[in-house]
């Protein structure tokens, strides 16, 4: 039994060992005058990227032919876990590519940030495969501890320290709520395993009346609140704009991409597989509407790029929760397609922001001369913004179309209507980027330095997928359908 567990968990074990070796490497060479910053940080970045790519290969080689329960039923490997882990590792690899030159540009001697990004990726891999409330909570806490530190990693910046402190205080509060919910579920049912919980709740109507039912209801409500805080859904979004703005840009990019995949995957496992009940649909229905409306309206007033992207992220979480609210196979499939396309667009836009950071690009108005000084980058950013806005035939339109179609299929007409209206409103601030780049006369001309080769390659790949996704969406459809079936059958 132990041998099978070891083989199945070999990718995670490899990544943990690689992270520890990288930490030792960084500590040893940080005292050397020849190999210290800046070569050290870049070397750690490249080795970290290599570790992630090898982990992707190990996960791909060990593709599951059947469902496997590991470590006394605390973890599970199935098609849903497999594809989510590969997708998470690809998004982490994208972040590592973006950070190769970032620390040199910002004069940050912080190889520890790369090590912590890898460690949080390990925790997210375990989070995706968690099959027990205790295993899930431990994985979420390991991820959160890494995030608290990297949010405040720019030690000479008051904004970064403030961001880390805010995230720590509010994150600790949400983790406490999540743990309290898990303890209530255990107290009223006597089990923590997802499979056992699914058997208990099959055909069991949860209401506020009756001591046992109300206790279970409150427990699941607390778990839902803890999750919604982690994915920045309204009304638990308060921390996101300040933390996104104050954190180093590469950390903001990582916060926008990786946790969304792991937390949403975990939410699907918990609520669709174990606790599925129409009661939770109403909660996510409300959060979806609130997130879409606030994300669309609050972003209109923003002048800073990172703050606007934070509200954009909140709005997109609202769109993804449409699929969650449906509770159907089509809804889950549309949510998974939505996550994939959202991550592609977010990687793209942050790669551009990081490329322009060489000149301390901070405000949207700073884009004034981009169409004339770097027309290719301006076209790339325009395509991404049109995709964010949901302009056909780009990938962003396909994502929203499938989500709204799933909402109509399950009778959630109000959800689809509000989604369409907020999409139209969001066009204003996305297309404002294009207007500033092409039609505004800049007060001061900024000559942007050429982008490094790694980011150029990353941008080329993401823009290609965003632009031509509509021509051949079948592979993603097949993969997401398999993942949805794993949860529903």
Swiss-Prot record:
Keyword Electron transport in the entry? The reply is yes
Q: Which domain of life is it from?
A: Eukaryota
The protein's topology relative to the membrane is:
Multi-pass membrane protein
The catalysed reaction is: a ubiquinone + NADH + 5 H(+)(in) = a ubiquinol + NAD(+) + 4 H(+)(out)
Gene Ontology terms, MF aspect: NADH dehydrogenase (ubiquinone) activity
Write down the Pfam families for this protein, in alphabetical order: Proton_antipo_M (PF00361)
Can you say what this protein is called?
A: NADH-ubiquinone oxidoreductase chain 2
The opening ranks of the lineage are: Eukaryota, Viridiplantae, Streptophyta, Embryophyta, Marchantiophyta
Record's subcellular location: Mitochondrion inner membrane
EC nos: 7.1.1.2
Listed under GO cellular component are: mitochondrial inner membrane
Q: InterPro entries from the entry?
A: NADH-Q_OxRdtase_suN/2, ND/Mrp_TM
Keywords for this protein = Electron transport, Membrane, Mitochondrion, Mitochondrion inner membrane, NAD, Respiratory chain, Translocase, Transmembrane, Transmembrane helix, Transport, Ubiquinone
Is Transmembrane given among the entry's keywords?
A: yes
What residues form the membrane-spanning segments? 9-29, 47-67, 80-100, 114-134, 168-188, 216-236, 248-268, 280-300, 309-329, 335-355, 376-396, 401-421, 459-479
